[in-house]
Each structure stands twice: as structure tokens, then as C-alpha cells.
Regions:
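Conserved beta-strand segments of the P-loop GTPase G domain that flank and frequently precede/overlap
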Residues: 34-36, 287-290, 338-341
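Short secondary-structure boundary/capping segments
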Residues: 49-55, 150-155, 302, 351-357, ...
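Short, conserved secondary-structure transition motifs
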Residues: 338-345, 378-390
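GTPase G-domain guanine-specificity segment
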Residues: 344-369
Length: 491
């Protein structure tokens, strides 16, 4: 039997919160949408673009309620949770539209409510539905989601898995200073705050090195060691894994038991409250991933992304909500895994990025033995920063993308100032993603993956109408994501 992730008291509080949400939903129908992502995948940009396109009548041909003209009004409203910071939509959209800079990434949880007035497509529903749906968007770091599996692991299991992973591939080099310090530590010695702090600092430095752009690894729990916030320096964040001898365990008052106690405190103080107060109350979820960056960084980054997706999908229980499950044990009934930055590819490769991500998800689902019902995959660009063109070279027409590289970007030895546009050949993904995974599985040292040019482009310049009103933010397949995530709730 798998270990329980929550206590009976936690379950009771979750059931009470779901009951309160259900009662509120009878008067004001609501869907709680979780938005998270792995390794700079663009959560803030996704939310900002989604809200901007709904508020400003964006081009959403695949979002049926808007395409059919059934949505009559869209507005922002006060969020229901006063203790949760508000997602600062106005600041983020100003950065995108006016300043043409990408907004800061998510470092803590935030929330935003957007409400749609609509006419139901069903005559029966028009009689009984209030014709209003509130979408509570809950934005949280992907590192927090990757912490949830820790609830089912004791300190020994966490230590064994983390230490074993640290000695594989590129992690072996990145973890060398931390592992050297760990091996030199006497776990039987008395608890020592300075030793604990040194180990925790070295462990956090290793996790940060794994996350850096040049590595782009995704499996990085405990996440709050990367984003400590107001818990920085607390005992609950001052711990690290330690190797335990096969026989016996250190006695009371030892460094080992000190670290074990702090690991359990991390779960109680950090992980459980997030699960109980936020995650367990979600109805729908989108997980954004930067699959292009992983491919660009090589086989280990792709394998690590698959490992992270396995851990992520194991957290969900996709399926249909019955009345009883809604009241007592809320179930996330739809999960979308979306590969971002589709605008970095020519449209001919969009379906290939989709297929690559779908294969990653299928492999993750197979590894954990869960059904794929309620899970969808797509490639998208929350904000389209490029346009497509063709150039002639040696008598052949080549598909290219055109955009404004960010200041400091270097392409083929040329450094850009953030003002000048350029055309680049983005590279190709394989038609059959299986060929890519076969190359990775071969285990051959130095195996080459598709060469994809990942360039950081500035957000696009938005044209204005004759009345001086800026058009909505351009995107790729954002409307399709909306349709999957909450289109059915507007039927």
C-alpha cells in the first residue's frame, strides 16, 4: 500500500475547504485553474496573455464560447483568498506590451480571478445556469509541485535517492563540492549548527547549478531551497541528505537525527500546507515545460525532464468529479502539459514539438503505471515573439523566423542591441520523436540531438487601431489550451 501523503486531520481540513468551495460555487460557479511550470517555462507570460486576450477580444478561433459569440462580458474581480498575494496582472502586461520586456518569473504563490458572462449553448442550461463563470487562476512555482512526492518519503529514502542521482551524468561534476563535504561528515557526531548550515548551503548551491541555463535540469527537490522566501535561514530549510550505513542508525542527538527532524519539519511547514491549502483545491491544471531548451542542452536534460514529468504526473489524480468527490476529495479532472516557445520554430515543426512532448508524457505515464485519461499535450506560445518568412540560399528557399533578439544575445558571433530584427533558421525537430529517444537510450557518449537555435527574443511590438487601442497579444494555440482547460464549463 502506498504511504499516506496526509494525516486524517489534513484530510478533514481539505474536505471542509472543498465543501466551502462547493457551497460558494452554487451561487457563483467557479473553476480553480493551477498554473505551474518547470525551469523558466513562462508561467507569468501564459497567465498575462490568457487574461489580456480574454479582456481585449483577442483572436481565439479555437475557443468555442468566444468564437460563437456566447461570451458577452469579461472582467477581473477580487479574488476569494485574501491571504494569498494577488497576481499582478497590470504590472506584467505593462512589461510585455509597453516596455517589451519579459516579466519576472514566479517566486511564490499568487492568485487572480477573471469572470466571464456567457450564454449557455444548451437551452436546458440557460434555465438553471446563472450564465457566469469565475476562473480562479492559481500561479505557483514548479519547484513546489516537485516537492509533493516528498510527502511519501522518509529521510532515509530521500537521502538515498538524492545522493544516487547526484552521482549520475553531468550532476556528478556539479555535485562534487557538496558530496566531498558530505563524505567528510561524521553522521554519528553530535548535532552541530555550523556543520548543518555548511551542508545545507553546499546542497543548495548544487541544486542552483543544476537549474542554471547551461544545464537546464528539472528534477530539483526540495524546491524551497531554491526559492526560500521568508523561510530563508530557518531550521526547516537548513538540512541536506546524508548517507546512512546499511546496519543501524545514529543515536539521539546526532547530526543524522537533527537532519532527519528538519527534513520532517520541511514537509510539515512547507509541503503539507501547500498541498492542503492550494493544490488539493484545484479543478484543472496546466504544466508548462521548455522541451526545446532540454533538447538544446542534450540527452541528460531530456532524461531529466522526463524524470520530472514522471514525478509531476504522479501528483495528479485525473478523472471525473462526482458530487461526493467534489465535496470530500476534490479531483483534478484535466491536466494539460504544454511545451512553450513554439514561436521559436517554423510552423512546420509545431506538430513535431507536440509529438516530442507527447512522447515524453507517455513515457512518464508508463513509468508510474497510471491511465492517461484527462491528460492532454500541446505545443504553444503564450506570446508570439516572431513571425515567419523565407530566405533564398544557394537557389533554395529556407523557412526562417524573424524577431528582435534581446540585448546581449549573440548569434553567429554577432551581438545584438535589443532594437534590430534578424532572421534565423530555427533548426528542425525529427518527424518521429522515437528516433530521438532511441539515440538517447543508446547510451553512446557524446550523442548529438537535433540542433535547435534557442534565441531569446523580445516581446513583439503591438500595432494600434485607428483609435489608438493596442491589439491583443499574439499567440500560438493559446485558444486551444483555453478550450481544453475550461471550455466545457462554458457549454
Amino acid at each position: 500500500m502506498p504511504p499516506r501523503l496526509t494525516s486524517l486531520a489534513d484530510d478533514a481540513r481539505i474536505a471542509f475547504d472543498n465543501l466551502a468551495d462547493r457551497a460558494s460555487g452554487l451561487v457563483n460557479p467557479t473553476v480553480r485553474l493551477g498554473v505551474t511550470g518547470l525551469s523558466r517555462s513562462g508561467k507569468t507570460v501564459f497567465i498575462s496573455s490568457l487574461v489580456h486576450n480574454l479582456l481585449h477580444g483577442g483572436r481565439l478561433p479555437l475557443f468555442e464560447p468566444v468564437q460563437s459569440g456566447r461570451v458577452s462580458a469579461v472582467r477581473l474581480e477580487p479574488q476569494p483568498d485574501d491571504a494569498v498575494p494577488r497576481f499582478q496582472y497590470e504590472d506584467h502586461i505593462r512589461a510585455l506590451v509597453k516596455d517589451r520586456i519579459w516579466p519576472d518569473s514566479t517566486r511564490a504563490i499568487s492568485e487572480l480571478r477573471i469572470t466571464l458572462d456567457y450564454q449557455s449553448a444548451s437551452g436546458w442550461n440557460r434555465l438553471f445556469s446563472p450564465g457566469r463563470l469565475s476562473i480562479d487562476i492559481v500561479d505557483y512555482p514548479g519547484e513546489w509541485l516537485l516537492d509533493l512526492p516528498l510527502l511519501g518519503k522518509d529521510y532515509r529514502m530521500f537521502s538515498e535517492e538524492t545522493l544516487a542521482l547526484a552521482e549520475t551524468g553531468v550532476r556528478c561534476e556539479l555535485s562534487r563540492p557538496w558530496l566531498a563535504l558530505t563524505r567528510a561528515t561524521d553522521i554519528h557526531a553530535g548535532a552541530d549548527e555550523m556543520i548543518a548550515r555548511d551542508l545545507a548551503t553546499a546542497f543548495a548551491d548544487y541544486l542552483k547549478a543544476c537549474k542554471a541555463d547551461e544545464r537546464s535540469l528539472s528534477t530539483l527537490p526540495p524546491g524551497r531551497l531554491l526559492l526560500p522566501g521568508d523561510l530563508d535561514g530557518s531550521p526547516a530549510l537548513t538540512f541536506a541528505p546524508l548517507a546512512l550505513p546499511p546496519n543501524g542508525r545514529p543515536g539521539r542527538g546526532s547530526l543524522w537525527t537533527m537532519m532527519e527532524r528538519r527534513y520532517e519539519a520541511y514537509k510539515s511547514v512547507v509541503v503539507k500546507p501547500f498541498f492542503r491549502e492550494h493544490f488539493a483545491r484545484l479543478d484543472r491544471q496546466i504544466v508548462l515545460v521548455d522541451a526545446l531548451q532540454a533538447v538544446n542542452r542534450g540527452p541528460e536534460a531530456v532524461q531529466d525532464l522526463e524524470r520530472a514529468l514522471t514525478d509531476v504526473l504522479a501528483c495528479f489524480r485525473p478523472g471525473t468529479n462526482s458530487l461526493l468527490s467534489s465535496l470530500l476529495g476534490r479531483r483534478i479532472d484535466r491536466v494539460l502539459v504544454a511545451a512553450t516557445k513554439a514561436d521559436h520554430l517554423h510552423h512546420e515543426s509545431h506538430d513535431r514539438l507536440d509529438a516530442l512532448t507527447r512522447r515524453l508524457v507517455d513515457r512518464a505515464i508508463d513509468r508510474i503505471g497510471m491511465a492517461g485519461a484527462g491528460i492532454d499535450v500541446m505545443a504553444l506560445a503564450s506570446v508570439r515573439a516572431t513571425r515567419e518568412a523565407t530566405v533564398k540560399r544557394d537557389g533554395h528557399e529556407l523557412p526562417v523566423i524573424v524577431g528582435t533578439p534581446m540585448e546581449g544575445e549573440t548569434i553567429a558571433g554577432e551581438r545584438f542591441d535589443g532594437k534590430r530584427k534578424t532572421a534565423i533558421f530555427p533548426g528542425d525537430l525529427p518527424e518521429d520523436p522515437e528516433s530521438l529517444f532511441d539515440r538517447i537510450a543508446s547510451g553512446v557518449t557524446g550523442v548529438q540531438l537535433p540542433d535547435v537555435n534557442v534565441v531569446r527574443f523580445r516581446p513583439p511590438h503591438l500595432e494600434e487601431t485607428g483609435g489608438g487601442i493596442k491589439l491583443s497579444v499574439p499567440h500560438i494555440r493559446l485558444d486551444r489550451a483555453m478550450q481544453f482547460l475550461f471550455g466545457d464549463r462554458l457549454a
